[in-house]
UniProtKB/Swiss-Prot annotation:
Name the UniProt record assigns to this protein: Histidine--tRNA ligase
Gene: hisS
Binding partners and assembly: Homodimer.
EC number of this enzyme: 6.1.1.21
GO cellular component: cytoplasm
Family of the protein in this entry: Belongs to the class-II aminoacyl-tRNA synthetase family.
Gene3D superfamilies, per the entry: Anticodon-binding domain, Bira Bifunctional Protein, Domain 2
GO molecular function, one term: transferase activity
Length: 430
């Protein structure tokens, strides 16, 4: 039997993980600058958590969820998105308590799972950065989080990212719009896709999110949510737009945008990149003021987003952005003879304890072969250990490029390698 990774998954080998680590480091720094704290939640949760959060009629629930019954008879699902888990953790751990500073700002970097047809930028196991800000409703919160995503793109050097913006209004506005949408779509019912016919009376906003050609043609002339906003929702959206303009963040209004999840209200947004002639959403989110209360927590306004890491990397590669820092090694220890093996092990550990990155030879090869390995690893310095060096305690530390070398002792290296390191690089520093 030939063992292979499951369809829709990917192995991340060292050359790839270096890119991931770079992006994660940048993202962690941006989130920290905005005072967000990391949260980690289980990869699997109760099926009901996700089905209730994302909506029984959503594609996630009806087509994409990985769910199963465990050995205890519990209905379990692999996490398809991060917000529901963050909200569950917020409630279960009583982060709504008065002694907890509001808003509660959380971020995560986690794998998600959806049973989709694998294609470019869409895997069955994929990874997202997510942020959730819970406890305050203020247009400035919405804009700060949108600005944070914009900052991350800029720090990564990603260009051509466009912000698409819409509002779903409050409950009163959505109710009025829902009826207007039903009235508009009903005459076209027989022309809609099977999924959209099913959703027409259950959740007509879902029809706007359809990717089927027949649905896209029909909703093109559908009424816009912006025409059904009450005064409160209008004023809130105007505040959001004004704050974005104050920060010089350009945006376009997409009145048909609804996002793929049921819990949103008021501000929703997507960051979109043109990729091979198609629009690719790399980040999306919005406000979800009713979700905490829906799960029996206290009324809690909230705002957040999810950002696809694989898509981010795909865009960066297309734009020829190199996320791989140059790999270097501080010291390579060339080892000659069995008697030097013990000393090489001790020396390598000593240097690592002094915060130097070290590799050594384990194969007792010829020196020429070891030096070639040092070259491939990008070693800056080489220490050669043979029987003579072990017997006398005298060694030479050689720069692999300039060939400059310093004679010293094993004892001195064990005590403090930093002065020796600095001596070798003294000419370059001066």
């Amino acid at each position: 039997m030939k063992l292979q990774k499951p369809k829709g998954t990917a192995d991340l080998l060292p050359a790839e993980t270096a890119k991931w680590q770079y992006i994660e480091e940048i993202a962690r720094g941006v989130f920290n600058d905005y005072n967000f704290k990391e949260i980690r939640t289980p990869m699997f949760e109760s099926y009901e958590l996700f089905s209730r959060a994302t909506g029984e009629t959503s594609d996630i629930v009806t087509k994409e969820m990985y769910d199963f019954e465990d050995k205890g008879g519990r209905h379990i699902a692999l996490r398809p998105e991060g917000t529901a888990s963050a909200v569950r953790a917020y409630i279960e751990n009583k982060l709504y308590a008065p002694e907890v500073v509001k808003p509660v700002k959380l971020w995560y970097d986690a794998p998600m799972f959806r049973y989709e047809r694998p294609q470019s930028g869409r895997l069955r196991q994929f990874h997202q950065f997510g942020v959730e800000c819970l406890g305050l409703k203020n247009s400035a919160v919405d804009v700060e989080i949108i600005a944070m995503a914009d900052t991350l793109f800029r720090q990564l050097g990603i260009s051509g990212v466009k912000l698409s913006l819409n509002t779903l209004g409050d409950m009163e506005s959505r109710k009025a719009y829902r009826q207007a949408l039903i009235d508009y779509l009903t005459p076209f019912e027989n022309q809609l896709s099977e999924d959209s016919r099913r959703r027409l009376n259950e959740n007509p906003l879902r029809v706007l999110d359809s990717k089927e050609a027949e649905d896209i043609a029909i909703v093109k002339n559908a009424p816009a949510i912006l025409d059904y906003l009450n005064e409160t929702s209008k004023a809130y959206f105007e505040e959001v737009k004004a704050l974005l303009e104050a920060l010089n963040i350009e945006y376009t209004i997409d009145s048909n945008m609804v996002r793929g999840l049921d819990y949103y209200n008021d501000t929703i947004f997507e960051f979109i990149v043109n990729f091979d002639g198609k629009e690719l959403t790399v980040c999306g989110g919005g406000r979800y003021d009713g979700l905490v209360e829906y799960f029996d927590g206290p009324a809690t306004p909230a705002f957040g987003f999810g950002l696809g890491i694989e898509r981010l990397l795909m865009i960066a590669e297309k734009q020829e952005i190199n996320f791989i820092p140059e790999e270097t090694l501080d010291v390579y220890i060339a080892v000659m003879g069995e008697k030097a093996n013990l000393e090489a092990t001790k020396l390598a550990e000593s240097l690592r304890e002094q915060a130097f990155k070290v590799e050594r030879d384990f194969s007792n090869r010829k020196l020429g072969a070891q030096f070639k390995t040092a070259e491939k690893l990008g070693a800056e310095l080489i220490i050669t250990l043979g029987e003579d060096e072990v017997r006398t305690g005298q060694i030479k530390v050689k720069h692999n490029q300039t060939r400059k070398q310093v004679e010293t002792t094993l004892k001195a290296v064990h005590e403090s390698f930093a002065p020796i390191f600095e001596e070798i690089y003294a000419d370059e520093i001066n």
